[in-house]
Amino acid sequence: MASNFDGIINPGVASRIADLARSYQSAEPFRHIVIDDFLNEQFAGALLSQFPAFEKGNNLGDDGAPGRKSTFERISRLGEAYQALDRFIQAKEFLEFIGEITGIDGLLYDPFYLGGGTHENRSGQALHAHVDFNYHPSEGWHRRLNLIVYLNQGWGEDWGGNLELYRDPYQDPQPAVKISPLFNRCVLFDTTEKSWHAFDPITLPAEAANLTRKSIALYFYSRHRPAEEVAGKHTTHYVNRQIPDHIKAGHTLAPSDVALLRDMIADRDGLLQRLYAENSELRQAQDRGLSGKLIYLLKRYFVRFRK
């Protein structure tokens, strides 16, 4: 493997491309792979130590108030480790490396990190099942791959925050695969109209209440994609979490069930409020004429594509 990999990718990972490619191609419910100890251990540690403070990132919700999620897109503005990562993932050698694993040629790096970069989530946060936006907003490239590296040392099995992969959340509300967000674990998967993914609620115990779920999200594109995968341009498409199978007629609700149902109702209420607010803004923009419409559309575009 090229010297460009030295000190960043674990040599044991870089030396088994053929095995990784076979695993990737055969994975269900859609093509993906989990690679433990993905990065050089010291480099992964440097990324964690230089991870931006929660308050430094974009931590405002759609309502404009601080939330339980913070993202920082322009990672090249962070410490030396992030600058090295930024240089590395745009190099031809790395793009060809993940291209060999996934079978996708001509992969492109996103210099804007739209929707990507560092992601940090506090206890109580979850992410509903969704498929991602499918075209780069400014370049028009096809979005092809998600690569996530987790930076959570000592993460407990029952702390939630597990990446969930679905066949179809409309038909089956239970994930087909659950992946713990363990330190230096990489998850690489296709971005298609069928790559439904989420993470379940983070439930940190009192002794770990100061911790957060940390990850780095990298997205890759191409100028073309197979005709059978091409779809109309859309933003991120969410499906609200469904009622778990164990909650049915005759079931006695546990405190955790009640908390879950309250969160689900709050999520739906929040969605309705956002839709009503968006509709109201659109009507007001229409009343203001062309300039008002343009300002409204730009605001909505920003909110939807930063997710």
Enumerate the predicted regions with their spans:
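N- or domain-start disorder-to-order transition segments that initiate the globular core
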Residues: 1-21
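Non-heme Fe(II)/2-oxoglutarate
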Residues: 21-101
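Histidine-centered active-site/metal-ligand motif
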Residues: 32, 130, 197
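Active-site rim elements
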Residues: 33, 75, 80-88, 132-137, ...
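Non-heme Fe(II) oxygenase catalytic core, chiefly the N-lobe of the double-stranded beta-helix
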Residues: 49-52, 86-143, 152-154
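Catalytic core of Fe(II)/2-oxoglutarate
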Residues: 138-143, 153-287, 292
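Eukaryotic charged/polar low-complexity linker/IDR segments
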Residues: 146-148
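Low-complexity, charge- and small-residue-enriched intrinsically disordered regions
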Residues: 299-307
